[in-house]
């Protein structure tokens, strides 16, 4: 997975952190969690706020 795999990242986050408050989540924590996902091989500096917002929104949708 890389930063542009928004849906795949959201699914992986939901599987790994099913009880996390994904609405009130700091982007620094979200970035750290994504970098720690199995199968994630994106560059640590390869994201920005827009990408993190998209991942967070997809994660919220995935949970609903």
Where are these regions (language model features)?
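A charge-rich, low-complexity, intrinsically flexible signal that marks solvent-exposed coils, linkers
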Residues: 1-64
């Amino acid at each position: 997975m890389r930063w542009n795999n928004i849906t795949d990242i959201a699914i992986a986050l939901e599987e790994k952190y099913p009880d996390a408050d994904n609405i009130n989540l700091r982007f620094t924590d979200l970035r750290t969690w994504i970098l720690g996902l199995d199968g994630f091989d994106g560059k640590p500096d390869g994201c920005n706020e827009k990408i993190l917002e998209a991942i967070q929104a997809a994660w919220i949708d995935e949970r609903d």
